[in-house]
Curated annotation (Swiss-Prot):
Entry annotated with the keyword Transport: no
Function: Required for mitochondrial morphology. With UPS1 and UPS2, controls phospholipid metabolism in the mitochondrial intermembrane space.
Protein family per UniProt: Belongs to the slowmo family.
Protein name, as recorded: Protein UPS3, mitochondrial
Membrane topology, from the record: Peripheral membrane protein
Keyword annotations: Membrane, Mitochondrion, Mitochondrion inner membrane
Gene: UPS3
InterPro entries: PRELI/MSF1_dom, Slowmo/Ups
Extra remark: Present with 672 molecules/cell in log phase SD medium.
Domain PRELI/MSF1: 1-175
Organism field: Saccharomyces cerevisiae (strain ATCC 204508 / S288c) (Baker's yeast)
Keyword flag Membrane: yes
Length: 179
């Protein structure tokens, strides 16, 4: 099993980051995400918790050696379940790939919370992903997991840049609304 962790600070209040999160994809930078469909959304805990289940469609090429295992497909699907908790001001998203889980399973958790030192203006982002290959041979299994981490890392960079652009766009809207 391989893992990937990343954390950032966004110079926006948690409420704004959480709002912008729903518009994060698709964007011009993260072109691998081609669709995000809401499957279910409901309020829990007397309206304090918003539960959302989404299907994320991704299109990207796989290396030739991987096509031996998965065929010539370039589409993948990810199930994401998120909770927004107004009481503790947290957004937690958990996702897992639905495509080819017998070859590579990716479990991701993302969490947005107010920064403890500046909770009114800064939001902490923490991302943790685990990669587990189901390929029976150790050498090939490690190659699959390493490829998964590398691809995920590359996409995470694009995701951060893309989300920064979404936040900047929303910031302009928020500023204009307050004028």
């Amino acid at each position: 099993m391989k893992s990937f962790q990343k954390s950032y600070e966004f110079d926006y209040p948690w409420e704004k980051v959480t709002t912008a999160n729903w518009m994060k994809y698709p964007n011009k930078i993260s072109t691998h995400v081609i669709a995000v469909d809401v499957l279910r959304r409901e309020l829990k805990e007397h309206g304090d918790v918003l539960l959302t289940e989404r299907l994320i469609t991704i299109r990207q090429n796989t290396p030739h050696w991987m096509s031996i295992l998965v065929g010539n497909t370039n589409l993948a699907y990810v199930r994401e379940v998120s909770t927004v908790d107004r009481r503790d001001r947290s957004l937690t998203m958990r996702s897992c790939n639905m495509t080819f889980p017998h070859i590579l399973k990716c479990y991701e958790t993302v969490r947005y919370v107010p920064h403890p030192k500046n909770p009114s203006n800064v939001t902490l982002f923490k991302q943790d992903a685990k990669f587990l290959s189901g390929v029976p041979t150790k050498t090939f299994s490690e190659k699959v997991e390493n490829w998964g981490v590398k691809r995920f890392s590359d996409n995470a960079v694009k995701g951060k840049v893309g989300f920064d652009s979404i936040l900047a766009m929303f910031n302009d809207i928020w500023k204009n609304a307050n004028e």
